[in-house]
Amino acid sequence: MEYAQDDTRVSVIILTSNISNNRTPAFCAGGDQTVRSSDGGYDDGSESAPRLRVLDLQIQMRRCPKPIVAVVRGYAIGGGHILHMCADLTLAGEDAVFGQVGPRMGSVDAGYGSVHLARTVGQKKAREIWFLCRYYSAQEALQMGLINAVYPNDKLEGEVGRWVRRMGMLSPTALAVAKAAINADQDGSAGISLMGGHITRLFYMSDEAKEGREAYLEGRKPEFRKIPQSKL
């Protein structure tokens, strides 16, 4: 995702899975319980201190300036359910299945998996999803506002292309600022700081900022008030 975020040729990031005809389709079935550690993280032997690395991915998805589209076929449950929620948009095939399973196996997500879910579908529905651990069809997910659209499996790829091409025609800076603004209230001061970062970058491109920089380099006082846009 880091490469896609920094690649100027990429306008939209698609998050999906490799569907095989020989296996039950799944977007993501959640965390691997075989490497879940008693130390509170997931330990696959690669780190001395287990930690929830998926949280790093969730934060990265939220902070990424480019739109992220989750394309779901089959199961998106547990951690996979949270993963698609952290994407900006979710487009699903008609065989998609959504839901939480954590409490069945002594697991829970007290971060985006709970807070963002409640903001998306409402308090009562979020509690139902966590407290009952039942599965929801693509149509049910669409009705509760959990996803954006459902398409027949054989039409999904083409429809995703339509969504992506439309976003690719829009201003990338406008999309980045809109994403940061939408996330800001939920992400607290970190979200507000990210939105402020976009504003700072845009300010650096202004005539006022250029005048300030050039005046400093030339050893003179800046003449901000002579710039037409300086109205404050």
Predicted regions mapped to residue ranges:
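C-terminal long alpha-helix characteristic of the crotonase
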Residues: 2-5, 91-96, 138, 147-195, ...
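Conserved hydrophobic packing residues within short motifs/helices of P-loop NTPase cores
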Residues: 13-15, 69
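Glycine- (often His-adjacent) and acidic-residue-rich active-site loop
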Residues: 2, 9, 16-63, 76, ...
